[in-house]
Structure formats: structure tokens, C-alpha cells
Amino acid sequence: MAGGTFEVNVSKKRPGDYINFKSKRQQSPNGSTRGTALIPLIGLGWGPDKGILKLTSASPDAEVAKLGHSIYDTNDFMLLIREAFKNAVTVIVYIINNGDKATKTAGGMTITAAYGGTRGNDIAVACVAEAGASTFAVRVYLGADKVEEYTGLATIADLIAVNSGKYVVFSATSTSANLTAFASTNLESGTDGAVQNTDITAFLDASEKIKWNTMVFPKDESSQKTAVITKIKYLREQCGKTVQAVLPDAESDYEGIINVTNSYSVDGQELTNAQACAWVAGATAGADKTTSNTYVAVEGATDVVGLKTNEEAIEAISNGEFFFSMSEEDEVIVEYDINSLHKFTTERTSDYSKNRVIRVYDSFADDLKLTFPPNKFDNDPDGWLVMEGLGRALLQSYAKQGAITNVDAENDFYVDQSKSIGDETFFNVGLQAVDSAEKLYFSVSTR
């Protein structure tokens, strides 16, 4: 008997069974991911100016040469990275460093730090004659650590040829000259340049081109904080980037800004509110659409700096402040996972002040962009049917994960066919985010 597949409206010549198989299962929408914090290292004193480094929790020290430090070093900039990594999966750092490079002349060479800034003054170089040979070893130190060593060298040209350039650059009038031994000598005259508002503007502009979830701005300068708030509003409302920023003592009234108004002690150090923003940014980036950070403990923290009284806490919440408290177990915890929105309207109700709810809305917006890219579907009844199927599957996925509730798939995601003409398709979508049970009221009857 004849058989095979068939095309609609194309008749077969031979009698037989012709069978087409077609899956009715809808394509599963891809999910967006979270976990990335963005930190500007303002005046780091080392590293490529305007350089962008991507650090991961799997290998946080992969960029030691460009940071000039291990993230575990006792250093205020590294502290920011460490605090963010307590919850973030990825930390992207943007380096602002417009200082002068440290230099030194030794052994007939000029030795210049790879980057500007005062960290270059901690670099030392030694040229040592190798035993039993007419060759030399050149060693590069950063602080007490030997970071590079080149052996079997005879001339300056030999050294230049093998030098990585990660820490220092060697130059000489005559590179063919033989190396000569010299004791360990420190580079000097490296300076940290003054940070200008234009440097902050350059960082904020660069942030448009990077994929991240939460930015920490670890400075308490009013005009710079205003610039950050303006940029976040622009990114959310004009660019469609579902991001938030964490700032210290920033009086704002916007769901994209988290206003941190106290801090905590860690490793014997009292952090400023600006430094505490790093942990908040990491925790916010690391939390997903079904998670709240209310009452989450701060790993390693021992005390609250600027602990609020009951009345102060009530007022702070009313003003949209994010702050730390002490739990009954004597742990430093987040009092309430809220953003700075505190003046509510019919379009921005009180639930928009809850960061878990914002993560639901932001994640859904990201998933819509992943599921419905331009030029993927036909703008006709067949295309609308496919798109509605995908959208309703997305709603069901969110409901199954516990991110939204009260889903009526048919009425909560559909194409407005009367408006969908040409290359424009309009959707009507309904969402009710699930929040965490954070205020529990018990009516107890005693007998």
C-alpha cells in the first residue's frame, strides 16, 4: 500500500494512507535570569579607566591583575565586591581611574606601571643574576606578593619580549643592552586623579550597554545620586531595562530606587550606609520573582549601625527606606524588602513598593521580550493564536512557580485584534503578583 506524508490541496495519484504528524504542544517560553549586580569602583587607584570586568561567584579572583587586589584583601573597594557576592552570582565592576602611572628607572630601563593610580606605588621590581649562568631573572611584586617572574633573560629586549604587561611595562633607549642586576625597587609617583561628574556620567551611559539587574552606587554625593536616579528612570521607562539602583540616604519616590538608611558591622568594621548598599544590591539581584528579602539575615554581620527605634522604624517604612534591624536571634536582618516608592496613586499602588512584586513584574517584562521578539510571528489570526498560546503558557508557568495567582488564561492574555494592524500587535495582559506573608495577625481566644 502506498503511503507517506501529504500537502494540503495537493492530491496523491496512488490509493493509500498519507499521514502528517504535527505537535500540538506549544513552544515553552524561555525564562529570564537574575543574579547580576553592577558596581562602579570610583577612584580605585588601579586598573583600566572605564574598564568593565565581569566577575563570577565561581571564580571571583579571575581579574586580580586589573583590580590590583584579591577581592579578599583588606580594601574598601574589595569589600564592596565581597558584600555583593554574598548573594549575587555575577558582579560587574566598572573602573573609574584617571590617575598618573607610577614609574622607576633601574638597570638602564624605565619601568612603568600598567595602569595609573597609587596602587602602582606598591609594585616593586628586582633583577637577579641566575646562579651558574650569564642570565637574569626579573621578578615583579605587588605588595608582599610575587606576581610575575621571568627567567633565562640576557638582554632588555628578551625581557620586553616575554613581559605580559599585566603589571608593568619595560622600555629603554637601547633594548639590545644587556640586563644588569638591581635590588628590589619600588615604583613611585603614581597618583589618583580627581573624579569628575563627567566620569559618573560616562559610567551611567556605559550601564545602558551592559546586562545587569541591580546597581549599587556607593557614594553619598547629592548631585551624583540625582544623576543615578534620573538614569534609572530613563532606563526603566525609555529603554525597557528592568533594573534597580541601591543608593545611600537618597530621598526618592520610585520603585526603581532602593534607599538604604543605615548599615551594619562586619569583620570588626562599621560600614557606612554607602558601603552597605553593596550587600543590598547583591541580595536584590540574587533574589528571584518568588523571593522576598524581608527578615533575611546578613551573612557575617554582627551589629546594626544606626539601629532604629520602633517609632523611627515606622516612620522610615512610611518614607520608603530600606534598613537593617536585629532579630530575636540577635542576627542582623533586613527589616522590610521595600523600595523608595511611598506616595501611592491609582497607577502605582502600595504593592509597587514591594521589591518581590517588582521582581515579578520585571521578570515578566523580560520574559515577554524573550518570548516575543520582533519579526517572529505573523500579524494575522494564525499568528495571534500562536502568540496567545505562548503568552498563556507563560502565565501558567508563573502561576505554577508561585509568582502570580488568580490566573484566567483566556482573559488574562489576548491580542486586541481591532488595534493589531500592519506591523503593530497589541496585547491585553492581566497579572496579580503573589507577595510574601510578612505581617501576620493572630486572634487568640483564651479559655
Predicted regions and their residues:
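Structured, hydrophobic secondary-structure cores that serve as assembly/anchoring elements
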Residues: 1-93, 251-447
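Extracellular Cys-Trp
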Residues: 88-295
